[in-house]
Amino acid sequence: MASEDRYNVKETEAKWQTAWAEGGCFTAREDRTRPKYYVLEMFPYPSGRIHMGHVRNYTLGDVVARFKRAQGFNVLHPMGWDAFGLPAENAAIQRGVHPATWTRQNIAIMREQFKPMGLSIDWSREVSTCEPAYYRHEQKMFLDFLKAGLAYRRESWVNWDPVEHTVLANEQVIDGKGWRSGAPVERRKLSQWFLRITRYAEDLLAAIGDLDRWPDKVRLMQTNWIGRSEGARVRFGLVGRDQALEVYTTRPDTLFGASFCAISANHPLAAEIAATNPDLAAFIAECGRMGTSEVEIETAEKKGFDTGLKVRHPFDPAWELPVYVANFVLMEYGTGAIFGCPAHDQRDMDFARKYGLPVRAVVAPAGVDAEAFAKDLEASDTAFSEDGVAIASGFLDGLPVSEAKARAIAHIAELGAGEGVVQFRLRDWGVSRQRYWGCPIPIIHCDDCGPVPVPEDQLPVLLPEDVTFDKPGNPLDHHPTWKHVACPQCGKPARRETDTFDTFFESSWYFARFCAPHDTDRAFEREAVDYWLPVDQYVGGVEHAVLHLLYSRFFTRALRDCGYLGVSEPFTGLFTQGMICHETYRDTDGAWLSPDQIDKAADGTATLLSDGSPVSVGRSEKMSKSKMNTVDPTAILESYGADAARLFMLSDSPPDRDMDWTDSGIEGAWRYIGRLWRMALQPQIDPGAVGAPLPADLGPGAAALVRHVHKAVAGVTDDLEKFRFNAAVARLRELTNAIAALDGKEAGAGAVYRFALETAARLAAPMIPHIAEEMWSHLGRDGLLAETPWPTWDPLMLIDDQVTIAVQVNGKMRGTVDLPKDAKREDAEAAALALPTVLAQLAGAAPRKVIVVPNRIINVVV
C-alpha cells in the first residue's frame, strides 16, 4: 500500500488491479440505452514475450478506453491472440515441442505479462485463433464464400518462400524477399485457393474517401495498392497467325510511337515458343529467379529475348513490330503484355537503347517547335512522360493528351481492335499456405468429383495432433491417415486439402468475433455485432496498411453480402502509432551489444561493463532483437511500475511518431508519480471539504487555481479526443505545478487544494490509473475512479480576466505588465511606472505623458 512517506508501486498497482477485476469494471454488456464505443488494438502474435511496442500500442488504446468510459460510453475493449503461423512450426522443429503446446504456453505467459500494465480489458471475451471454437466458423465462412463465388481455385504463378516452404501473397513480398524469412522469393506455378477481392475493388477504392478518421498516409497506400487506372485493351494481330496479342495500356495516345511489344516470361505465348527454343526457356528460367517486387523489377537491368514473332499495328496493318519476352513485364498486371513507346516511357527507352529499337516522339509540350523537340528527344536517352499535345500521330495531331486518349480509344473500338477498360492493380487474394499450423481448408479432393466442400455438419476439420516435422514442407502432406477420407459425394477414396489458410484470414474477422465470442453455433450473434460494430477506434502499426487493413475491409463486405454482418467498414477510426527506438551499441569487433551490457557516461561515451573497453554508440533505431537494442518491458514494470511506463510512453513524443527510449525518461516519469503522491499527503488539504462546494470567498491565488483547473479539464479533454496524449500530459504537469504553488494561507486554499488534486486525479486516470485511484481514495472519495464520470468545466472560467500589456518608453519595448482586463487608466499607469526598466529610463524625472491603449499598450513618453 501507499504509506504516509513512500509510494509503494507494486502493492498499490496490484491492489487496484484486483479491485477493478473484482468490481467487473471493464466487463462489457450490450446496453442500448447508452452510446457504445468499441476500442481495439491489433491483437498480438503469441511469441512468448511482450515487447515495448506492445506497451505503447496497448497504452494508447487503454487511454482511449478509459477516457470514453468516463465520458459515459459503454466501452468494449477486448483482447485475443493471432495464434496460427510459421514461428510455432519453427519452434516445433528447433525445440521439439508441438506448435499447439508452444502457442498455448506463450499465450499464458504473455497474458500474465500484460495484466500488470493495468489495462482496462474485458478478459472474459478473450479468443485465440488456433482453437477449433474459433476456426470452425472460419471454415463455414469459406464454404459460404465458395457458394457466393467469392472463393475459387486455379493454377497460378505464386511467390514461393524457399525457407518457409510456403506461398506468400504479393503484399508479403518486401523488396523481393519473404516478409518473415527475408529469403529471396521464387516464382512457381501451383494450384491455389483465392478470395475474389477484386469484385470489391471499385467499392473499396470509392469508400476510402469516407474514412475521414484514418491517417492520410494509410488511405493513400490503399488507394495506390488498389491502383485504379483507365486505359484501353488493344489487340495487335500476330503476323502469320490467326490470333492477336492483347495489350493493356494507359497511354493509347502514344500508339503512333510504338516500336515493339513485350510479353511476360509467364505469358502463354512465351511458354509455347520456349517449348521449342531452349535459349528462350533459359531466359524464362532466369526471369523466374528475379525478385518479385515491382520496385526490384523496375530497378533491375531491362532484359529481353526476341521471339522472332511480329505483330501488326492496329492503326496500320503494314506496320509490323517485334515481340520480345521482357523481364519487366508482369503477368499479374493487365494482360501480361505491353507495347513499348520509348520516347514517352523511361523503362521502354532503356529497353529500346539496349536492343537498338527506334524511338519516335509523339507527344510534345504545348507551344514548342514540335519538329525540333522530336529531333532532340529521339536522340536523347531520357523519355518525355509529361502531358502535352500529340504530334506525328495522324488524326490525333494537336490534341491535348487527355483528349488524344479518348479519341484513340474511340478509334480502336471503331476498328474492332479493342475497347476502353478500367483496370486495377489489385489482384485476388491467394489464401493457400503450405504449412501445418494454420486453419485447415475444408475441401476434399476426389478424382471423379473434383474439389468437394466438407459437409457443414462435419465442421470443424481439425488439425491432427500426431504430426512430425522431420521432413521439409507441410507435415499434413505426409500424414499417414489424416488426409485419406471418403468423398462426401460419391463415397470413393479421396484426399483432404492439405493447404491451410493464410493467417491474415483469421485476422480479417476477429474484431467481429469479440462481440459475442462464446456463441458456439454462430460466428456472430447478430444482435451483438449490430450493436458493437464497427470498431470505433482501432490502434496498430502502419505496416498493415495494405495487408490486414485492406483484407479486413474486403472481409467485412463479403460477410455482409453473405448475411453475417450489417456493416460495410470494420473500423471507423484508425490510429497508427510510431515505433519505439533505442540507441545501438557495438564493441570493438563490430558485434552488437545490449543496453544492459554497457556503461554510458554523462558525455555520451560508453564502455563495456565487463572489461571497460570502448563501445561505439550508434544512432537510435527501431528496437530489434538483431541489433540487441531492446528493453525488457517486464523488467521496467517490475522496477518502475505500470504508471511510470505508461506515462513515459505518452509524454515523450506525439503518439504517431517514433519515440526514443531513455533511462532518464522512465526515471523522470517515475519521479512524477512520486510527486503526485506526496502532493496528496499535504497537510493543507481541507479534510472537511469532501464533496462540498467551494467557498465563495477565495483568495486571489486560490481563485486563479480554480480557473486553471477548469482550463486544464477543457484542454486535456480536447487533447485526449484528438490523440494529443503528450499535450495532455504536459497540461497535467502544468496543473500540478500550479497546485504546488498555491499559498496555503490564502482564504479557501485548503478546499481549493483538494478540488484541484481531485480533478488532477480524474484527468490522470486514463493515463496513469493506479496513482489516480490511490489519490482519489486517500482524498476520501467513495467508489472507484475507474467508474467515476469525467469532470466538466465552466466555459466562463476559460475567459481570461487578466491581460498582458506591452510597456514602451518613447515607442521602444521595455517590458510587460499583467493587469485585470479593462483595468482603470490610473492603475495601468502606476503598474507601468513601477517597472524597473521604466524607472531606469526615467532616471528620477517625471514622464512628460503616459499614453494608455486599454488592454494593449502603455507608452511612457520622457
From Swiss-Prot:
Q: Where in the cell is it found?
A: Cytoplasm
Q: Where does ATP bind?
A: K625
Q: Does the keyword Aminoacyl-tRNA synthetase apply?
A: yes
Instruction: Look up the record and give one Gene Ontology term from the biological process aspect.
Output: leucyl-tRNA aminoacylation
Keyword terms:
Aminoacyl-tRNA synthetase, ATP-binding, Cytoplasm, Ligase, Nucleotide-binding, Protein biosynthesis
Motif residue range(s): 'HIGH' region: 44-54
Q: Which InterPro entries match?
A: aa-tRNA-synth_I_CS (IPR001412), aa-tRNA-synth_Ia (IPR002300), Leu-tRNA-ligase (IPR002302), Leu_tRNA-synth_edit (IPR025709), M/V/L/I-tRNA-synth_anticd-bd (IPR013155), Methionyl/Leucyl_tRNA_Synth (IPR015413), Rossmann-like_a/b/a_fold (IPR014729), tRNAsynth_Ia_anticodon-bd (IPR009080)
Q: Where is this motif: 'KMSKS' region?
A: 622-626
Instruction: List the Gene Ontology MF annotations in alphabetical order.
Output: aminoacyl-tRNA deacylase activity; ATP binding; leucine-tRNA ligase activity
Q: Which reaction does it catalyse?
A: tRNA(Leu) + L-leucine + ATP = L-leucyl-tRNA(Leu) + AMP + diphosphate
Gene Ontology cellular component annotations, sorted alphabetically:
cytosol
One Pfam family of this protein, by short name? Anticodon_1
Q: What is its EC number?
A: 6.1.1.4
What family does the Swiss-Prot or TrEMBL record give for this protein?
A: Belongs to the class-I aminoacyl-tRNA synthetase family.
User: Could you tell me which NCBIfam families the record lists for this protein?
Assistant: leuS_bact (TIGR00396)
Q: Output this protein's name.
A: Leucine--tRNA ligase
Q: What is the lineage of its organism?
A: Bacteria, Pseudomonadati, Pseudomonadota, Alphaproteobacteria, Rhodospirillales
Provide the gene name from the record.
leuS
